[in-house]
Amino acid sequence: MRYNPLAYIRSEKDILKLVNALILNTKGEGEKSSEDFWVKAERLYYSALIGYIWYEAEPEERNFITLLDLINASEAREDDEEFQSPVDILFAKLEKEHPDHFAVKQYRKFKMAAGKTLKSILISCGARLSPFDIQELRD
């Protein structure tokens, strides 16, 4: 039997609760309990991605594996602010169709950071979720 936390989302408030639980329960030893810039930035990105998955993905793709795949497809380049990753392209398309979409609003806030900062945020997101990105969970 598998547990899919995204299956319990019914509202945007639930997305935020899930993101809070994810951050709280993956805090490393020695990590400060006060929330710094990096954690807040991660929170924005997770909210955007989970919002996208919940609203836009096919029912069978509304799961943690899709979240991991989106994070793995994310990229920022310090030397090229115009570069667009596959995830950037997904959100650009969604923004054209639905500029007030919950996920788009979260993503816009996340993308306010410069390339070097975005890269650091993405590394933090990848590091936080790396224990879940194993074949056993994908099967």
Language-model segments: residues:
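P-loop NTPase motor domains
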Residues: 1-139
